[in-house]
Each structure stands twice: as structure tokens, then as C-alpha cells.
Amino acid sequence: MAKQSMIEREKKRAKMVAKYSAKRAELKKASVDMSLSFEERMEAMDKLAKLPRNASPVRQQNRCRLTGRPHGVYRKFGLSRNMLRQLAMQGDVPGLRKASW
């Protein structure tokens, strides 16, 4: 199980991304808009760079909802491979069963 502080840190990042997403999108759009002058585009890039680092969605890490494990997480289920296997073997994931061919 991951440290509780790491799980909380990811939750904090998710809130930060949601808070700044509209402003980031607006500044990114302005920074590539060729109808604006060079100075205006550079100003938009500067403002974008001054936003908090954790406001960028690329800094988010997918984590298992049950254990907080950062690697081997299936997006469809939000679970790590270990927990997905365990729950599937118990029959707790509807429609999922072990492959056999």
C-alpha cells in the first residue's frame, strides 16, 4: 500500500489541475494564435510558465483506487493489476473472467 501522503498529494494535484484547466487552455490557445502579435504571444507563454507546476495535467499519476499503487494501473477499472486479478478471482468485477483458449 502506498503512503497516505502520496495518495493525498495526488488528490491535491487533481484539484489544482481542475482549478487551473480553463486558464491554462486559454493561455495555451493565445500562445499559438498567429493573429496576435509576437509580444502578446510571448506574454501568454510567460503567464503560462508562471502558473503552479502542479496545475499541469502531465504531472498527475494514475493510482490504484484501493491501494494507491502508481504502476500497473488499468484505466478502465482504476485498479492496479494485482488488485484487479484478486477481485476478478473473487468474482467482484462484473463481466470479467479469466481467459482460457
Curated annotation (Swiss-Prot):
Alphabetized UniProt keyword annotations: Ribonucleoprotein, Ribosomal protein, RNA-binding, rRNA-binding
GO terms for cellular component: cytoplasm; small ribosomal subunit
GO biological process: translation
The keyword Cell membrane is annotated on this UniProt entry: no
Disulfide bonding pattern of the chain: none
Subunit note: Part of the 30S ribosomal subunit. Contacts proteins S3 and S10.
This protein's name: Small ribosomal subunit protein uS14
Source organism per UniProt: Hydrogenovibrio crunogenus (strain DSM 25203 / XCL-2) (Thiomicrospira crunogena)
